[in-house]
């Protein structure tokens, strides 16, 4: 193994195809985010993968179709097992969470699993002792080279476009996992109230302050900028919904399904700057196992150029923190616990 790989075992980072393949052949336990051609070129081994081409690295944001972002779990996890989840079996992912550990779930973007996870899990949230994290795969939406979203079970060498795959990871007795969410957005308190009658990823008709409107027309009329999410409160949590540009003629595609009866407003425009994210991130934990970032925040973060970034990770079509999140940073943290906390 090359010297630079030895020094970075157990860490996240951007690697070439050959470096990633070498880690797989060495038996490392990996989560891989990469271009579809890169993923399908990797050998079988103990890894899961999802399509992604935008990443936050130590000194900025990059798009790469040649390199893979690798999260190495080998030195963190005591044992692991694979789970496969088509839409009709998705709720069983909660039943499969380890008693002490975490689960890392990858979902193909715009699949029925994506819609179902975003819509139903927000409503049926269950208390668990171990966290569920991960991301929704997808890349380059709205561009000429947009990719077909899929996830990969690298253990068996199988590609899935309509099912989620998960690694259920068990920790040692003296360790505990938790997740934290960095959300730079809040509701614009003075904004219009927007509601939708059904759960959907493609948004057409809505009600604005009780009046029926075409949502795409409303977004254009109010010159809503790319990167400004809808924000709503769901069971006490603030959830963002990323809107994809360019808009359709009479529809808008979202990266998380809207929920019926939830009152949405657009986030405050002054929260779109990178400094707002930095201010919120300062309060977050620095020692993390993995970080996932919202795809809709990439333009905002990339504009800031080469500045130190505390949380390397992929920009995904959705971040998982028990529920489906948009335009946040989700951190997976594993900590040692005191002896009196160990049962």
Model-derived features with residue positions:
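Hydrophobic alpha/beta core scaffold segments
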Residues: 1-343
């Amino acid at each position: 193994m090359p010297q630079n790989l030895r020094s970075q075992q157990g860490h996240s980072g951007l690697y070439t195809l050959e470096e990633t393949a070498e880690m797989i052949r060495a038996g490392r336990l990996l989560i891989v985010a990469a271009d579809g051609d890169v993923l399908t070129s990797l050998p079988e081994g103990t890894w899961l993968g999802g399509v992604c081409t935008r990443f936050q690295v130590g000194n900025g944001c990059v798009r790469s179709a040649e390199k893979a972002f690798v999260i190495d779990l080998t030195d963190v996890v005591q044992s692991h097992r694979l789970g496969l989840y088509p839409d009709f079996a998705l709720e069983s992912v909660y039943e499969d969470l380890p008693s002490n550990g975490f689960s890392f779930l990858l979902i193909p973007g715009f699949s029925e699993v994506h819609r179902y996870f975003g819509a139903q899990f927000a409503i049926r949230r269950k208390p668990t002792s171990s966290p569920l994290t991960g991301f929704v795969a997808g890349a380059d939406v709205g561009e000429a080279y947009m990719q077909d979203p899929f996830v990969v079970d690298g253990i068996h060498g199988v590609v899935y476009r309509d099912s989620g795959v998960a690694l259920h990871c068990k920790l040692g007795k003296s360790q505990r996992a938790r997740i934290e969410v960095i959300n730079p957005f809040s509701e614009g308190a003075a904004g219009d109230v927007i509601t939708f009658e059904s759960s959907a990823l493609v948004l057409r008709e809505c009600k604005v302050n009780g009046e029926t409107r075409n949502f795409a027309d409303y977004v254009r009329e109010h010159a809503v900028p790319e990167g400004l999410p809808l924000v709503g409160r769901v069971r006490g949590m603030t959830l963002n919904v990323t809107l994809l540009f360019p808009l359709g003629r009479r529809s808008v595609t979202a990266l998380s399904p809207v929920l019926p009866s939830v009152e949405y407003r657009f986030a405050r425009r002054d929260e779109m700057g990178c400094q707002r994210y930095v201010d919120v991130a300062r309060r977050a934990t620095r020692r993390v196992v993995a970080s996932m970032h919202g795809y809709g925040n990439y333009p905002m973060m990339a504009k800031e150029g080469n500045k130190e970034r505390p949380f390397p990770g992929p920009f995904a079509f959705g971040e998982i923190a028990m529920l489906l999140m948009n335009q946040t940073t989700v951190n997976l943290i594993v900590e040692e616990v005191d002896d009196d906390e160990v049962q």
